[in-house]
Amino acid sequence: MTDARKALPLDLSLENKVKDLSQADFGYKEMQLSEREMPGLMELIAKHGAEKPLKGLKVTGSLHMTIQTAMLIKTLYELGADIRWASCNIFSTQDHAAAAIADSGMAKVFAWKGETLEEYWWCTEMALTWPDGSGPDLIVDDGGDATMLIHKGVEAEKNPALLEKSYDNKEFQIVMNRIALSMKNDPGKWTRVAAKVRGVSEETTTGVHRLYHMEKDGSLLFPAINVNDSVTKSKFDNLYGCRESLADGIKRATDVMIAGKTVVVLGYGDVGKGCAHSMRGFGARVLVTEIDPICALQAAMEGFEVVTMDEAAPEGDIFVTATGNFKVITGEHMERMKDEAIVCNIGHFDNEIDMAYLEDSTECSCLNIKPQVDKWTLKSGRSIIVLAEGRLVNLGCATGHPSFVMSNSFTNQVLAQLELASNPDLERKVYILPKKLDEEVARLHLARLGAKLTTLTDEQAEYIGVDKTGPFKPDHYRY
């Protein structure tokens, strides 16, 4: 049964909670290093910094607390926002980045690498709660946890019977314990908070799925902007970012030689495409699993072998999940894997791999090799190496995507926040940024790569029916 006593109490007198403030100087140095690689954010500061369009607005961030995110926070701060921040993953915080932001005073930060799930949800609620008990005007979300906590809180306030139940999902039970405590200490909190939220901008595929589901069933409580499906996010962060950061995570964790190995990539969306091409670039034989015939055909025509997981389980040396679905690697699959096969996930949540099978079985045992690297002995007698406890391998075992590609994503995030700030009367729907802004994000990053655009003549623009300054493609165009 849900039990408020199991939730960590909020302490609104806390300015910050990070692992080690003495790491702030290191964080500042890395932030300075990333500036040149994040031209989109720097341009937004130059363009909007003087007018402070976010002045007087409270912003909650629930997004990986990395050096790149520190630059996003700096941008929001320079635009006038009052900011509180938590990470959206228990392993993704870079403690020197959190220390630098906490020390700078640009935001109140509640994040450290290696949080427990109870601590994680405490941090999320701390980021959503100002000292006077009020909540945010705007939310920057990644995976939808901050948005979900508000929605589940409102749902429980309307139907307290939800708190009388027990939940099989361990993490969801922790969420409900958290909500039970907030309802005990501050009745009506979540309904009050939700009513003041102007909107949320969502970073990733998983969070966007949640938003569209709520929009469809009529439960979405405030407007949302789908940042993930901006072309300059999904076709860059998801594809090119994963193409570099996946290998970084696997190699830092295991020092394994990828060349000559068989790598199984589950899912061939934008993230899966980046992963498959990365592994092939390192010399691996790559197998792909897919449910979508279009994505499967794309993979096959790129020369990848498209198989089922039942076929791939005994073949793979390294397994990478990138589906956004759950239990795509089951206990049965793991039992059939090679001895010491490496299993990791680059989707947002930890349920793509059936970690419960490993954790709940008395016949499976775990030996921790080093942080975020566990050797699980299976019923079969063989072992597998699980990275980051099934959570994001690129952020759990390395430092995530490079600064340049994150500048694309985070420039979209800031533009989305500006749209929400300047349009307080939007309907409770999921929006996407207009094509003109998408093209502008790309334009801001060209000079850093030495790229130069061709300019249409008046006659050429008229011939193809576009404005000389864009947009150059219709909304339905697939890049």
From Swiss-Prot:
Gene3D superfamilies tied to this protein: Adenosylhomocysteinase-like, NAD(P)-binding Rossmann-like Domain
One GO CC term, this protein: cytosol
Q: List where in the cell it is found.
A: Cytoplasm
EC number of this enzyme? 3.13.2.1
Which EC class is this protein assigned?
hydrolase
Q: Give residues annotated as binding NAD(+).
A: 204-206, 238, 267-272, 290, 325, 346-348, 394
Q: Which reaction does it catalyse?
A: S-adenosyl-L-homocysteine + H2O = L-homocysteine + adenosine
Which cofactors does the annotated protein need, by name? NAD(+)
Q: In which pathway does it act?
A: Amino-acid biosynthesis; L-homocysteine biosynthesis; L-homocysteine from S-adenosyl-L-homocysteine: step 1/1
Q: Which domain of life is it from?
A: Bacteria
Coiled coil ranges: none
Q: Which InterPro entries match?
A: Adenosylhomocyst_ase-like_sf, Adenosylhomocysteinase-like, Ado_hCys_hydrolase_NAD-bd, NAD(P)-bd_dom_sf, S-Ado-L-homoCys_hydrolase_CS
Which GO biological-process labels does this protein carry?
L-homocysteine biosynthetic process; one-carbon metabolic process; S-adenosylmethionine cycle
State the free-text cofactor note: Binds 1 NAD(+) per subunit.
Q: Which SUPFAM superfamilies match?
A: Formate/glycerate dehydrogenase catalytic domain-like (SSF52283), NAD(P)-binding Rossmann-fold domains (SSF51735)
Sequence positions that bind substrate: T66, D142, E203, K233, D237
Which UniProt keywords are present, listed alphabetically? Cytoplasm, Hydrolase, NAD, One-carbon metabolism
Q: Give one GO molecular function term.
A: adenosylhomocysteinase activity
Which CDD domains does the entry mention? SAHH (cd00401)
- Give the protein's biological function: May play a key role in the regulation of the intracellular concentration of adenosylhomocysteine.
Q: Which family does it belong to?
A: Belongs to the adenosylhomocysteinase family.
Listed name of the protein:
Adenosylhomocysteinase
Say which species the protein is native to: Oleidesulfovibrio alaskensis (strain ATCC BAA-1058 / DSM 17464 / G20)
Organism ancestry: Bacteria, Pseudomonadati, Thermodesulfobacteriota, Desulfovibrionia, Desulfovibrionales
Quick one: which gene encodes this?
A: ahcY
